[in-house]
Amino acid sequence: YSPHALAAKPRDIFPLDYDTLPAALPGQHHYLLACVDNWAANPNNLGNTDGVMMVTFDTRAKRLLFTTFMREMLVQRPDGGIGRITYIAKNNGVEALARTISTHFGVKVDKYILFGMDNVQKIIDALGGVPITVTNEEADYLNRYRIARNATTPSMDKAGTYLFGGHAAVIYMRIRKVGGDGDAGRNRRMRTVLSTLAQQYRDVTLTQALAVLSSVTDNLCNTNMSMNDMLQALGYAMQVAGATPEGLQMPPDEAMEPITYADMSTRQVDFEKSRNDLQAFLDNSFVVVDD
């Protein structure tokens, strides 16, 4: 990280016009998943959305894409002011968050599901946990955090692969102060967990898929998706089952600049570069695959 630029005022931000955003590419279906930073989410009094991800099912190219969004970036708020993206849903609602992602990144995503951390924990438990390979530093952090001895199988010790229960997986996805890559690390860990779960369901049957869907619908805080929308999304997911998940961080590191704004550590973003990179990822003219 470079020293924070002490700018009196961030650069102006010019979002795109929502109503003239292009239609999704043929076969691509986007859904926004957001997780608030408390265990029990209250739809009428939301916390900060610390985890925001766009899931894309590309049924034409048989691709499964996870695009995560950095929590510290500055965006134009619905009132025209500038603020961190993590406060948009709390202050303006989840529709406003989906709209903000759409207009800043140039991809219209209007269907969303919002979770609390307890929802994510229950869903991962319902799916039988998730195998995760951790570094020594991550293992130390999880032990210092005092996750229960039975939170992973075997009990967390040092670097290696463990089966994580839901609670431990949520703590893992929230790690920020390990490895020196801050929020980028947190974004990467979110993509790792989702990608691993997807790969566990490579050969999913309809019965299993419906069980996964009911674990989601039983454990969400807020959504604008009808049951019909959910079943449609499940159909798309089954069409791309078996695809190797691809992940992208938005904005990319090189399109962000640290800036202290309103006494907060934030990131000023080159949205034009970000939109071009995201478009290229969706166009598949080049593919960025997480390690």
Q: Which ranges hold each PLM region?
A:
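Non-catalytic, solvent-exposed segments at the cell envelope interface
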Residues: 1-291
